[in-house]
Amino acid sequence: MCGLLALVGHAAGAITEETVDTVAGASHLMRHRGPDEPGTWADDQVVLGFNRLSIIDIAHSHQPLRWGPPEQPDRYVLVFNGEIYNYLELREALRAEFGARFATDGDG
């Protein structure tokens, strides 16, 4: 099971470099939950931390997951602990219906 954490500030600008460092330190303490890869992401109101236990696409599916249009690639950011067992079928359906393109086998 992966380890994840989030800190949400109450106002714009609430997240400082010190806050990000604190979350990174807390994430480091949870490295046994996901020893394969740590990751953090922050903006001025939210910090996400993640320790990945790799199952699918071990080399390329990094977290936090980021998605968005080319002009705003970090529009959506997500940490996720779980496995979608029918991901191949979902991928094909998204390709067929919406022309979706994927970057990796785990699309992270």
Stretch-by-stretch model annotation:
Residues 1-108:
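N-terminus-centric sequence/structural signature that marks the extreme N-terminus
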